[in-house]
Amino acid sequence: MAEQTEAPTTEESVLVITRVFDAPRELVWKAWTDPESVMRWWGPKGYTSPACQIDLRVGGKYLWCMRSPEGQEYWSTGVYREIVEPERIVCTNSFADADGNPVPASHYGIPEDFPGETLSTLTLEEREGKTELTLRTEDLPAGEAHESANAGWNEAFDKLADHLSQA
């Protein structure tokens, strides 16, 4: 099971979540970089992930989909800016359509103050056979967008912990 080691940072426009997973770093890396693995955990509780494309190289893109229990699909895309295997990924994040074209958050009924693009840095550090994951998302306004992203990521990380325990 994953444990949250720090409260999320509430600094204006930055969300930082740190979790420790009972799995080796290489396995956590694979969970983020292998499409079949991503589809096993991506999305909040109750959501599934029916599609995932990853072009894991600097300048490459990803296109991930999560589906709500009601059947609504939410697509996200981004560009990889930095990759240091198995330690760090820096990428942009945007809502998208099924073809990978960025769309505003309002396309999915999300308040318009949600930014068109954020920047995320994923860091994985080994800790005595476990992995400390830190996700830092920049350009995310304080308030509802910040709280919603925090809740969604933490639910996804709970699912990631379950996936890693079965891997």
Each language-model region and where it sits:
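Short beta-edge strand/loop motif at the mouth of beta-sheet-based domains
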Residues: 16, 36-79
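Hydrophobic pocket/interface hotspot
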Residues: 28, 38, 62, 80, ...
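Beta-strand/loop substructures that line and gate deep hydrophobic ligand-binding cavities in soluble
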Residues: 90-94, 100-154
